[in-house]
Amino acid sequence: MDLMLRILLGITIAIILHELTHLLVIFYYKIPVKAIILTKWTAFGFLIENENYMNDGKKLILLHFLPLIWCLMIFINPNEVFFYMFPFVNIFGGLGDFYFYFKIKTLSSKMRIEWANSCDEKLLKSAIWKREI
């Protein structure tokens, strides 16, 4: 298989698995989803009810850090460029997840929800496509 095709396939699958892992946590903890959006900055994501998970440390950690498990795919075959795309996408693509987690942890309980709701409003303004649920 051509090198560029393997890289593109690895990136595509890594992005899909990253977002599906977020969705798995959302469904497992029954966090209500407000909308699925596609934006020009954050690519693809889910807007969820912030009041449901903001003050629960376990949900917060799993929602933001569980997709990093895909970084372990490199150990399947470290010589294959396809598997290098999983840690690459999940570390660099997950920087937003890191930022949101640590920003949330620095705010008080009341401010967390207000800040998250204002972020949701900003994301909705930059949405290219939105599907409300």
Residue ranges and their predicted role:
Residues 1, 17, 131-133:
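Terminal, membrane-proximal amphipathic helices
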Residues 3-16, 83, 87-88:
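Membrane-embedded alpha-helical segments that form the functional core of polytopic membrane enzymes
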Residues 2-3, 55:
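Generic detector of short, locally flexible boundary/turn motifs and exposed helical patches
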Residues 46-133:
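Metalloprotease/metallohydrolase-associated module, dominated by Zn2+-dependent proteases
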Residues 10-57:
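Small-residue-rich helix-interface/hinge motifs
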